[in-house]
């Protein structure tokens, strides 16, 4: 792994997501948690993903389901579209686009999600997410600056 964090923050991994993945620090914001979860997918860190999933959403098979996806998916990049956070609130939203390739697929694909996070006892947890509808003439959520119809419309997961 290069020294830069896989979350595309342009910060060194050791100063960005690594402390969260090692469990030495808690993510101070929902966006930081989102970035750390992306980095956990890149580095195949199922423990961090499970620990940061809201307890009400953890199923007995979650670890096996996560581990099964790791060898088949190569994560290529994360683009944060927006973050709606208020330090006094216990709920926050982060909209992002993540580029990946499934091993048996030919094309890059994009996961576009508006994730919801809840804060419990000063710890942020991922609870759920929805895939926003993107108009064909809207800017592509991958961050390319091109229209969605000319960019990733056919590669959305």
Curated annotation (Swiss-Prot):
Pfam families (UniProt xref): SEC-C, YchJ_M-like
Protein name, as recorded: UPF0225 protein PMI1492
InterPro entries: NTF2-like_dom_sf (IPR032710), SEC_C_motif (IPR004027), UPF0225 (IPR023006), YchJ-like_M (IPR048469)
UniProt family annotation: Belongs to the UPF0225 family.
NCBIfam families: PRK01617.1 (NF002449), PRK01752.1 (NF002486)
Source species: Proteus mirabilis (strain HI4320)
């Amino acid at each position: 792994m290069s020294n830069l964090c896989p979350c595309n923050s342009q910060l060194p991994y050791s100063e960005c997501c690594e402390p969260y993945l090692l469990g030495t620090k808690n993510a101070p914001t929902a966006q930081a948690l989102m970035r750390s979860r992306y980095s956990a997918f890149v580095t195949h860190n199922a423990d961090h993903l499970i620990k940061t999933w809201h307890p009400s959403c953890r199923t007995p098979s979650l670890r096996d389901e996560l581990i099964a996806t790791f060898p088949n998916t190569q994560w290529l990049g994360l683009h944060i579209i927006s973050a709606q956070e208020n330090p006094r609130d216990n709920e926050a939203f982060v909209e992002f686009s993540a580029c990946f390739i499934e091993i048996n697929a030919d094309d890059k694909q994009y996961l576009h999600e508006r994730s919801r996070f809840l804060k419990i006892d000063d710890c942020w947890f991922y609870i759920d997410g929805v895939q926003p509808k993107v108009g064909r003439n809207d800017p592509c959520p991958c961050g390319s600056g091109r229209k969605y119809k000319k960019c990733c419309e056919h590669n959305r997961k």
